[in-house]
């Protein structure tokens, strides 16, 4: 150990942050030397090392190690010098000897120094270990050495070491080193020790250390053996190490761990209460996150007053303060470490060198000269400048902050919901403009992608470049939608403007917009959260890059969707961008895990280059050579970089393009209606190589059904059943209605899917909207700790909500037993599976178990270890909740706003609470994981052969209604059977839920929302009924009356009554049915009441009435008791019958023939509204006198002639255990459907009694083979009857049956009871009017008998009601007002009669007199049956109900006035009850006008009367006068005035107004109300016996006997007693029910189609479509305006370029003149340069005159000569002319006026002859022009919707032309023919269009044209520059033109391969075409092409003149394409 006296006080000891490194000075003989702590551990050993080396010689060991360190340090300094040299050369190489060792030293490597000798450097373990560690870099690199950067000697830097172009290389190197060291040291802190593998085998650790997590939850870090395996698997093994090296490495690891700051536990807000929650959040942020500050001023080499960190010297004045803060932080950490017994920290650290300069040559380093301190900037920023400030959260963090802490900050401190997708946007950092349409599409797509998927958008956060376009997308969203979108900005702290304003803890910073000029930038105001990343520098990029990468990689690897096992996907979106963007894309596509990238083509720069490279890269991953050259030049031009940098960028582009599966190019308009959002999501699906199930899961998590429909299910995969079931479960839980519909379209079997466990799980999920289910469950069952919803409890809730004695199937004993068995099996399977999945915790809502990560312990950056050690905030655990929610949950508040959160708050280990909501527990495991296993087990055991639920859609609809999922409930209503019943039940449930919500005083909108949902289902039920009625009325009547076994055995008609759906029951279909039921077997059209009364009075009159036929009576609903009796009687009668089979066969054959004819007749008829013989008018209601129909003998034989076959078949069916049915109700036997009713009634014999009819109608046709043929016809009562049935319909019933049908009709029962009641009232009135004798008379006994019988009937109704509990029976009975009146009347009469008999007669008489009021009111009950009186009775009842509120107010007013009046007027009274009467008596009568004028003011009246009598003055209050004046006598008259104003005028007027309103409202609905009440009347008198009181007890006695017999005969286990079911139903078998369901489903489809058509043709939809089309037209006009503006700019630019070209041409002409004058050119040549107005001038010696250019508008004489010259050379093939039909928006326009010249700005002379201009000699190369203009203006459009910078690149396909979605870029091959070899074909950058311009020389030149040669000039070196054309083409070539071009290419190719001399001669004879000829055909010529072609005639003219002058002239030289401008000029000069 080094002592303090060994160090000098002047020595500088520097200590940087512990996490990075510690540098100390070690004395060595004459001085000190600086070493790293990794190599100085032997000098400063830890206590462990000290104990191991006590016996050794310390001094000797120290000296030996110092010698070794000296040699190593010497070599390191040498290498450092080389590294610094490389760094100065801008080569990014890591320094050796620092924390990150990038150099690899192999033990056997041959490393020699400069002299060739072996250095003394020995292999060291620590550097080797670190080098291996950093080879396994998992992020920030493109692995595999795709583009290695060469380092020093044997070192090479991979992609992760290469900094982005805008990041300082040293900063990048240091930041990577710091982050890597921090990850490594965290592993050591967590107890992970490296045991390196030796040559002989693995080194086994002596002990196994386990470190527990700080969260206290028992999660432990893997043991060292596990860490060892992970270390070996990660590729960090080190071989060839000695034991001493291992020891040093272990000691070094221990020393490093001693200096490590232990990570702060993840924030868990459940640990804190509400009072200190905010404070603890702030403390946690301050303790967890750090900032980085510069600790020493080291002057920069460029500016001595500025530090290497970028700040000035004055900004470093706070270094002493930072030092103190740093020391305080270290001491606190040391104390913490000492408490944890990790190691001791040396606090005696000299920090004076933190702000002093060590040496003159020292360079500033981020690792050495920065320290990490606690963050001092976090809070809220308010962006000003808008209508209201936008608020955002921000925090300043260090660049090496762990992503786990950041995620904890997001989810728990800032309360951000976990992401389901990460969209990271990259692009240009400087401002740029997008094309208008592309900008609109990008904004719309990004907003849709973020809002629909729950994504997080991550940007740089700076208010420049691509971030502005992201902000524009968010601006288009609504405020509510924008608040849900999470946009996170990761911005560099050092580049932030006014960053000093952000410094403060929990500070609110007002932020005002500022200019974006300068190096620093501001924050964008559309972001919600900001991470201000700090690396200690100012004005530099790079800090945010590292943190952003680490955060994105952490999310993609460790963050899970919905807490399951699927990681959150990350996608990159590229918009424009520079070289840094290309580097980022390269990292994304080459890192692990891969990140898909979406590139927006047409946005500019990097995006366009990436899109072009992706499209044109070949299969071998390279670009074609010709395209590569053009792209290389375009890269140089676009980015303004050097050639080497351009090559590097091009290589990176190529590498990116090789990953085609990861790159998705979005091209506007290419994919139809698909926008950017579709491209983003499809890129994720195709870029991650996911299975179909995983793709479906992602689409489901994003809630993008369009992606699933177009990209997942469109591939034709064979989907396993389990995958579809899991997806359906997820869709149901998360309320994904569209996905449910999509999965149903894929053919999922819902009966197999929906099991008891899954339904139980659905009720217990905590996802979905808030609902009131828990509150209602708490009312019906006792809720305890850890309660979970159970299906039997849900059944109780349904029964409570439905009311009216509704019985749910969940509460039956059969279902309860089944539920218990299933739950036991689930628990058993779960326990059994725990042995296999013990390491997998339970899931909470994702449907997939969460598995613990088995990856290596990579530190906090890895994520899994942090979740296991420091808390459960990540992975599969639910996030903690806000304390407000917990408090509301504990207090039992019934507020609904946080109901779901309330239930979720109790899912963890929280204190017990008696009001605790349900806990999910392991429900997901039970439901979705073990269902298949349970089904297999059940199938193997044979215990389950049918699905758990017959109608799964009905069960799911109830679940959706109870959990308030309206869209899901609507979806389930549209699917499945019994749609009408489902709509009615949903309406009732919603109404009851709304009532419960109103009673609980929940939010008003919740109640109103539930009422709205109920109204929607009510309307749907009515629409469905109306549609079915118009399709087929007969089947609709059956739908209303058949028994619904799944809905408490009710009917749709009964459900409508329960729902109180007045409009439903008022429908004509229901009224027809009720009218038929009311009349029973009677057929009466007019005066039915009079006829029935006459029949009751005179029974013989019954025979004169009209009745229904026998067949019509068979098709009527019946009660359950009648149905049971019919089956029993039919069984007994059929068993005693016998007949021959021959007659049966004959009868059956005849029936079959008739049926076949009937079916053939009806087969082709369309479905219309049919009116069959079994319509509603033929239905009948039977009474409760069951025995009256069942008096036939049981042993009566069947008629042999008619019913032999029926009896025989019935006997066989009874023997097989079958059942029978009657009246349209058939039993089910072996799945064979019985025949229709009319066949059962077919008989040729006459029935002598009704037992014959009953026998025949109740026989079942089941087993006879002849009858089975009849059953195949499937004819029901709704089909058109055959002729036999029509013949049978005329048969009438017998006399005895007439009496029975008359007395059993409800109308007859009603009149019998009414007449009886009238007689009772008459006798009762008589007894009250006469004197009451002491003894009761006969009339009184009759009356008491009547009342007693009436009371017994009421008791029977109560007992036989459907409700099971007795109190429920009483409650149901009392709900009726008339029942209450009846009970009170009966009780008072019995009390009064007994008082009259056994007590005081007078008092008894009084009681009876009062009771007469109630009996008289009972008359209104009978009157309500009348269609006119009934509505008025309803109105009166409603008025009385509403009048009660006014009466209460009136009583208060009476009391206030009456009490004051009584007390003042009569002050001396003693107490008596009459005083209370006086308070109300007279004031009440004052309301009706009786004001008691004499008693108003008695004192004043007497004084006035005395005044009138005596004539004296008016004296008041004088005692001598004897006046009765009391104190305050004047007050009562004053009070009475106000009383009459309020009571008599105000309240009475209000009461009258209310009555008027009630009358008006009721009058409108009076008919509906009466029709609704009519059902109750029909059902009441149907269940009432015909015998009225006092004869009713006779019926009761018979009923008791039947009940006893039924109980004795029925089994004890039978729950349903048919005697208590009086509802009228049709009992159908399964086949008939299936037919009804088919009919209902067909009507549902027709109704849905009709509603869809109505919606599409509605005015709203038309207006919407018109609005959309108007927007499209407006956007198109905007695009056209933009194109027009762009065209103007291009034209202006072309004009300016032409002016510059003309200027250059004049200069060239001057040069040519000078050259010719120097060479003593002939006089003719000299005359050439003097422009002459005469174009045809010859010299005296015959030499040609000036060479002229023939342009449009020149002299017609020349045109004729040119024409003649062209005719002479017709034999030669014409030149290739390419005519592109293009629409240009830029320059190149040529006027057609004759006096307009193309290139000369000078006007023509006075004579009108245009002036001639000489041609230029040199090529008009566009390179001298500004490159910026060329890159922006020279664009040829390949796409109709947008332009790209790559449009100027010419694409050449040698073999075939590839036509893609863009506009065709034609290739033009120009020939460069050499005099000595063949021609070679080159690719022109422009579209192939040969513009051959012909010169117009003088006459001498024309004569010698045959000797002239034409030279073609091409410049491949400047190919890319020429490619940047200045016209934008918007048309494409046609197919015909394309074929012509191909032919021309073939001809040109053949010409190019001709012999050179032959070709040369052919070229001499080749005619030249004039420019006028080309332009005359309407072709638009590019001015650059014109200028280039002008070079040819000048060269030709010069050569001719040379030849004529006798100069030696060799073979014509043809300018090669590779010739540059200098070469061409020199060649021309030499020729001259």
UniProtKB/Swiss-Prot annotation:
Residues 129-162, 197-223, 831-860, 912-945, 1120-1211, 1753-1779, 1853-1909, 1935-1982, 1999-2032 are annotated as: Disordered. It is found in: Membrane. Belongs to the transient receptor (TC 1.A.4) family. LTrpC subfamily. Coiled coil: none annotated. The chain crosses the membrane at residues 1310-1330, 1332-1352, 1374-1394, 1439-1459, 1535-1555. InterPro entries: Ion_trans_dom, TRPM, TRPM_SLOG. Residues 839-855, 935-945, 1120-1129, 1171-1185, 2016-2032 have a biased composition (Polar residues). Required for initiation and continuation of postembryonic mitotic cell divisions of gonadal cells Z1 and Z4. Zygotic expression is necessary for hermaphrodite fertility. May be a cation channel. Gonads. Residues 1935-1947 have a biased composition (Acidic residues). Residues 129-139, 1951-1962 have a biased composition (Basic residues). It comes from Caenorhabditis elegans. GO terms for molecular function: monoatomic cation channel activity; monoatomic cation transmembrane transporter activity. This is Transient receptor potential channel. Residues 1130-1149 have a biased composition (Low complexity). Keywords: Ion channel, Ion transport, Membrane, Transmembrane, Transmembrane helix, Transport. GO terms for cellular component: plasma membrane. GO terms for biological process: defecation; gonad development; metal ion transport; mitotic cell cycle; monoatomic cation transmembrane transport; monoatomic cation transport. It comes from the Eukaryota.
């Amino acid at each position: 150990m080094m002592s303090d006296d060994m160090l000098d006080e002047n020595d500088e000891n520097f200590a940087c942050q512990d996490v990075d490194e510690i540098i100390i000075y070690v004395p060595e003989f004459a001085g000190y030397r600086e070493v790293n702590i990794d190599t100085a551990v032997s000098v400063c050993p830890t206590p462990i090392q000290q104990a191991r080396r006590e016996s050794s010689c310390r001094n000797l060991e120290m000296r030996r190690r110092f010698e070794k360190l000296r040699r190593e340090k010497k070599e390191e300094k040498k290498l450092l010098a080389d590294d610094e040299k490389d760094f100065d050369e801008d080569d990014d190489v890591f320094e050796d000897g620092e924390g990150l060792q990038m150099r690899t030293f192999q033990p056997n490597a041959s490393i020699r120094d400069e002299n060739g000798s072996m250095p003394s450097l020995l292999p060291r373990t620590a550097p080797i270990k670190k080098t291996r560690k950093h080879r396994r870099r998992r992020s920030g690199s493109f692995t595999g050495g795709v583009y290695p950067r060469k380092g020093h000697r044997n070192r090479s830097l991979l992609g992760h070491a290469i900094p982005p172009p805008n990041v300082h290389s040293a900063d990048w190197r240091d930041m990577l080193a710091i982050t890597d060291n921090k990850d490594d040291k965290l592993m050591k802190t967590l107890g992970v020790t490296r045991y390196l593998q030796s040559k002989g085998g693995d080194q086994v650790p002596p002990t196994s250390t386990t470190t527990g997590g700080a969260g206290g939850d028992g999660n432990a870090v893997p043991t060292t053996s596990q860490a060892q395996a992970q270390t070996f698997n990660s590729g960090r093994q080190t071989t060839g190490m000695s034991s001493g090296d291992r020891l040093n490495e272990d000691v070094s690891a221990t020393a490093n761990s001693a200096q490590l700051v232990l990570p702060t536990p993840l924030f868990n807000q459940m640990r804190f209460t509400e009072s200190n929650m905010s404070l603890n959040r702030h403390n946690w942020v301050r303790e967890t996150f750090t900032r980085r500050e510069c600790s020493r001023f080291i002057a920069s080499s460029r500016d001595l007053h500025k530090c290497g960190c970028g700040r000035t010297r004055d900004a470093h004045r706070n270094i002493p303060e930072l030092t103190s803060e740093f020391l305080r932080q270290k001491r606190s950490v040391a104390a913490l470490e000492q408490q944890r017994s990790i190691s001791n920290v040396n606090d005696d650290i000299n920090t004076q060198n933190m702000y002093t300069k060590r040496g003159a040559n020292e360079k500033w380093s981020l690792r050495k000269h920065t320290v990490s301190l606690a963050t001092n900037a976090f809070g809220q920023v308010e962006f000003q400048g808008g209508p209201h400030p936008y608020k955002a959260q921000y925090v300043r963090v260090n660049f090496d902050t762990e992503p786990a802490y950041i995620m904890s900050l997001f989810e728990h401190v800032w309360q951000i919901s976990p992401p389901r997708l990460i969209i990271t946007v990259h692009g240009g950092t400087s401002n740029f403009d997008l094309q208008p349409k592309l900008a609109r599409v990008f904004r719309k797509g990004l907003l849709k992608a973020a809002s629909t998927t729950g994504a997080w958008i991550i940007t740089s956060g700076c208010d420049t470049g691509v971030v502005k376009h992201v902000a524009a997308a968010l601006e288009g969203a609504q405020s509510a939608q924008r608040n849900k979108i999470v946009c996170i900005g990761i911005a560099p702290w050092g580049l932030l403007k006014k960053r000093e304003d952000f410094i403060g803890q929990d500070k609110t910073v007002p932020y005002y917009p500022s200019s974006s000029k300068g190096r620093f930038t501001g924050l964008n105001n559309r972001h919600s959260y900001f991470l201000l990343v700090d690396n200690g520098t100012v004005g530099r990029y790079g800090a945010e890059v590292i943190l952003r990468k680490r955060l994105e990689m952490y999310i993609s690897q460790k963050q899970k969707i919905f807490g399951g096992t699927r990681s959150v996907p990350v996608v990159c979106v590229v918009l424009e961008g520079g070289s840094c963007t290309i580097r980022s894309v390269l990292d994304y596509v080459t890192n692990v895990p891969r990140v898909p990238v979406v590139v927006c083509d047409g946005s500019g720069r990097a995006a366009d280059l990436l899109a072009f490279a992706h499209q044109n890269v070949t299969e071998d991953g390279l670009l074609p050579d010709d395209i590569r050259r053009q792209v290389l030049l375009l890269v140089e031009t676009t980015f303004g970089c050097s050639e080497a940098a351009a090559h590097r960028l091009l290589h990176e582009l190529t590498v990116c393009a090789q990953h085609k599966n990861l790159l998705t190019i979005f091209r506007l308009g290419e994919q139809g209606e698909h926008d950017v959002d579709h491209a983003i999501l499809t890129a994720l699906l195709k870029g991650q190589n996911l299975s179909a199930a995983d793709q479906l899961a992602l689409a489901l998590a994003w809630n993008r059904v369009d992606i699933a429909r177009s990209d997942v299910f469109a591939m034709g995969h064979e989907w396993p059943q389990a995958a579809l079931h899991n997806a359906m479960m997820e869709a149901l839980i998360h309320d994904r209605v569209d996905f449910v519909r999509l999965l149903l379209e894929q053919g999922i079997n819902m009966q197999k899917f929906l099991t008891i466990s899954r339904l139980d799980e659905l009720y217990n999920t905590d996802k979905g909207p808030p609902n009131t289910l828990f509150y209602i469950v708490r009312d019906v069952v006792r809720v305890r700790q850890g309660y979970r919803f159970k299906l039997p409890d849900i059944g109780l809730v349904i029964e409570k909500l439905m009311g009216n004695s509704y019985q749910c199937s969940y509460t039956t004993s059969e279902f309860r037993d089944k539920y218990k068995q299933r739950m036991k099996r689930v628990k058993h399977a779960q326990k059994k599976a725990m042995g296999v999945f013990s390491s997998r915790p339970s899931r909470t809502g994702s449907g997939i178990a969460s598995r613990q990560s088995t990856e290596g312990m990579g530190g906090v950056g890895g994520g899994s270890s942090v979740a296991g050690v420091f808390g459960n905030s990540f992975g599969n655990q639910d996030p903690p909740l806000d304390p407000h929610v917990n408090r509301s949950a504990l207090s039992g508040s019934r507020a609904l706003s946080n109901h779901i959160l309330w239930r979720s708050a109790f899912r963890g280990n929280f204190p017990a609470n008696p009001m605790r909501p349900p806990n999910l527990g392991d429900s997901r495991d039970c439901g979705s994981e073990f269902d298949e296993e349970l089904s297999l087990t059940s199938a193997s055991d044979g215990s389950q052969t049918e699905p758990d639920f017959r109608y799964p859609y009905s069960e799911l609809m109830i679940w959706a209604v109870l959990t308030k999922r309206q869209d899901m409930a609507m979806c389930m209503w549209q699917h499945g059977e019994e749609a009408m019943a489902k709509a009615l039940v949903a309406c009732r449930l919603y109404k009851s839920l709304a009532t419960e919500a109103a009673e609980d005083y929940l939010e008003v909108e919740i109640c109103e929302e539930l009422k709205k949902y109920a109204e929607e289902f009510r309307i749907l039920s009515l629409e469905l009924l109306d549609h079915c009625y118009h399709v087929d009325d007969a089947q609709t009547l059956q739908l209303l009356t058949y028994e619904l076994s799944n809905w408490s055995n009710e009917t749709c008609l009964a459900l409508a009554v329960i729902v109180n759906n007045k409009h439903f029951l008022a429908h004509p279909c229901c009224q027809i049915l009720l009218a038929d039921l009311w009349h029973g077997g009677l057929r009466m059209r007019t005066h039915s009441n009079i006829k029935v009364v006459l029949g009751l009075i005179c029974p013989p009159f019954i025979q004169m009435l009209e009745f229904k036929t026998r067949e019509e009576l068979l098709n009527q609903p019946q009660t359950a008791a009648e149905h049971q009796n019919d089956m029993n009687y039919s069984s007994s009668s059929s068993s005693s019958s016998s007949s021959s089979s021959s007659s049966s066969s004959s009868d059956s054959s005849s029936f079959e023939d008739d049926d076949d004819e009937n079916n053939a007749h009806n087969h082709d008829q369309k479905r219309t509204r049919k009116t069959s013989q079994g319509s509603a008018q033929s239905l009948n209601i039977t009474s409760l006198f069951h025995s009256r129909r069942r008096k036939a003998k049981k042993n009566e034989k069947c008629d042999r002639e008619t019913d032999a076959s029926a009896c025989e078949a019935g006997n066989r069916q009874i023997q097989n255990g079958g059942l029978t049915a009657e009246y349209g109700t058939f039993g089910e036997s072996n799945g064979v459907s019985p025949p229709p009713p009319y066949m059962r009634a077919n008989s040729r014999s006459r029935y002598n009694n009704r037992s014959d009819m009953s026998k025949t109608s109740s026989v079942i046709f089941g087993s006879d083979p002849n009858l089975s043929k009849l059953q195949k016809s499937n004819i029901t009562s709704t089909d058109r009857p055959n002729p036999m049935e029509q013949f049978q319909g005329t048969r009438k019933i017998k006399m005895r049956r007439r009496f029975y049908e008359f007395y059993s009709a409800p109308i007859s029962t009603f009149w019998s009871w009414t007449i009886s009641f009238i007689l009772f009232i008459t006798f009762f009135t008589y007894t009250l009017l006469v004197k009451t004798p002491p003894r009761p008379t006969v009339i009184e006994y009759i009356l008491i008998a009547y009342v007693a019988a009436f009371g017994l009937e009421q008791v029977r109704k109560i007992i036989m009601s459907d409700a099971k509990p007795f109190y429920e029976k009483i409650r149901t009975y009392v709900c009726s007002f008339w029942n209450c009146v009846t009970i009170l009347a009966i009780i008072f009469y019995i009390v009064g009669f007994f008082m009259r008999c056994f007590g005081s007669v007078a008092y008894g008489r009084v009681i009876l007199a009062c009771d007469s009021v109630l009996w008289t009111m009972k008359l209104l009950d009978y009157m309500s049956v009348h269609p006119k009186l009934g509505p008025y009775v309803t109105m009166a009842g409603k008025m009385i109900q509403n009048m009660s509120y006014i009466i209460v107010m009136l009583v208060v007013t009476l009391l206030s006035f009456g009490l004051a009046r009584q007390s003042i007027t009569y002050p001396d009274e003693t107490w008596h009850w009459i005083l209370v009467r006086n308070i109300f008596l007279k004031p009440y009568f004052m309301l009706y006008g009786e004001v008691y004028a004499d008693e108003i003011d008695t004192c004043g009246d007497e004084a006035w009367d005395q005044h009138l009598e005596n004539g004296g003055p008016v004296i008041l209050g004088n005692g001598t006068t004897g006046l009765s004046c009391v104190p305050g006598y004047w007050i009562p008259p004053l009070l009475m005035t106000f009383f009459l104003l309020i009571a008599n005028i105000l309240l009475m007027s209000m009461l009258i107004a209310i009555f008027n309103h009630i009358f008006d409202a009721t009058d409108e609905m009076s008919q509906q109300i009466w029709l609704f009440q009519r059902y109750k009347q029909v059902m009441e008198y149907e269940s009432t016996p015909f015998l009225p009181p006092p004869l009713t007890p006779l019926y009761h006695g018979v009923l008791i006997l039947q009940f006893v017999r039924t109980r004795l005969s029925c089994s004890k286990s039978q729950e349903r007693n048919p005697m208590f079911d009086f509802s009228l139903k049709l009992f159908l078998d399964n086949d008939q029910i299936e037919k009804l369901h088919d009919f209902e489903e067909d009507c549902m489809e027709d109704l849905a189609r009709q509603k869809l058509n109505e919606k599409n043709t509605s005015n709203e939809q038309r207006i919407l479509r018109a609005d959309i089309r108007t927007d499209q037209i407006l956007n198109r006009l905007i695009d056209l305006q933009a194109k027009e503006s762009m065209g103007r700019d291009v034209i202006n630019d072309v004009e300016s370029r032409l002016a510059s070209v003309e200027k250059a041409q004049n200069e060239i002409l001057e040069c040519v003149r000078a050259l010719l004058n120097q060479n003593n050119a002939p006089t003719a040549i000299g005359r050439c340069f003097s422009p002459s107005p005469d174009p045809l001038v010859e010299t005296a010696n015959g030499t040609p005159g000036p060479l002229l250019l023939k342009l449009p508008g020149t002299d017609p004489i020349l045109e004729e000569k040119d024409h003649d010259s062209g005719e002479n050379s017709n034999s030669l093939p014409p030149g290739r002319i390419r005519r592109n039909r293009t629409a240009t928006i830029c320059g190149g326009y040529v006027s057609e006026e004759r006096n307009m010249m193309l290139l000369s700005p000078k006007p023509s002379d006075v004579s009108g002859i245009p002036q001639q201009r000489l041609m230029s000699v040199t090529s008009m190369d566009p390179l001298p022009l500004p490159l910026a203009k060329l890159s922006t203006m020279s664009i040829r459009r390949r796409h109709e919707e947008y332009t790209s910078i790559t449009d100027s690149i010419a694409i050449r396909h040698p073999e075939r032309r590839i036509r893609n979605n863009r506009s065709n870029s034609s290739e033009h091959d120009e020939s460069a023919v050499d005099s000595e070899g063949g021609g070679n074909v080159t690719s022109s950058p422009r579209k192939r269009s040969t513009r051959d311009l012909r010169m117009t020389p003088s006459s001498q030149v024309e004569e010698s044209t045959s000797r002239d040669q034409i030279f073609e000039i091409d410049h491949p070196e400047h190919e890319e520059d020429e490619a940047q054309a200045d016209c934008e083409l918007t048309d494409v070539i046609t197919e015909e033109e394309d074929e012509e071009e191909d032919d021309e290419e073939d001809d040109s190719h053949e010409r190019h391969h001709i012999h050179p001399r032959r070709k040369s001669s052919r070229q001499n004879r080749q005619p030249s075409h004039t420019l006028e000829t080309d332009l005359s055909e309407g072709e638009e010529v590019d001015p650059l092409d014109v200028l280039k072609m002008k070079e040819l005639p000048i060269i030709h003219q010069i050569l001719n003149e040379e030849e004529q002058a006798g100069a030696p002239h060799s073979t014509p030289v043809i300018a090669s394409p590779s010739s540059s401008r200098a070469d061409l000029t020199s060649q021309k000069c030499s020729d001259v």
